[in-house]
Amino acid sequence: MTQTKIDLPPAFPDHTQLPESDGTFVKNFQEHPQSIILTDSIGPVLQQLHPDGDYAIGQDCGIYWRETEPPEKGAEAPDWFYVPNVPPLLNGEIRRSYVLWRELMAPMIALEFASGNGDEERDATPLSVWAEGETTKPGKFWVYERIIRIPYYGICEVKNSKLEVYNWLNFYYQKLQPNERGHYPITPLGVELGLWHGTYQNQTQYWLRWWDSEGNLLLIGEERAQLERQRAEQERQRAEQERQRAEQEHQRAEQAEQKAARLAERLRAMGIDPDSGQIE
């Protein structure tokens, strides 16, 4: 019996060998500061949800969802995403990409910061393979909805200060409506997502921010430190006011004591015992 030699394709690269970029530029100066705000402010929430530290946050990192050649054609890179219940490091190394079929855990939420009108982020073009072997590049929306199945997908139009959030339900994305605060509840995290106008890293504009379920803004480290400084200053002022009140009370007591002593001295000069009131 003749054995036929079959050449197997090479193994798919691991996360340290896969391309870290598809060659496109970061689309605007807001993108990286925006990612920092989201990661910094959600940190305390994720630490409570994952006391073991098993979660990962990707910022403009590739999610490889199919094997292709070149590999980056089978990847999408959300501007920000969070994956629960996976280690932040792989074999002690910093993650450089996320290979979906090896992790077996989809991101809980993915966010895109659209510089334009968001058409690219809403592209639902399906993957198609032609008879000639050519493929049609699928749209992000289709990949997130039909393949990766990310439960929450947010599109923030930076230029228009507009936010849309979709929830994966019954195999399709349903567009959510904001609550009375104009926020979108992300129920598994116990937080809300919305737009906040303010200044960060010398840029005053609308930023994508988190709030807790009661509508309190989740602060970044710089804001938390500033709040602590304000609290410390208020405590210092309160202590100083208390010290001044105590000093004033002490002065009043001394003045009353001195007044009583002077009165007693005058009474004695008149021949009256100040203690009994009798004439000596």
Please tell me what each predicted stretch does.
Residues 2-27, 31-32, 44, 70-72, ...:
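C-terminal interaction segment
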Residues 29-81:
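Acidic-basic catalytic patches of nuclease active cores, encompassing PD-(D/E)XK
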Residues 56, 151-152:
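Proline-centered loop/turn at the N-terminus of a beta-strand
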Residues 84-86:
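Protease-associated
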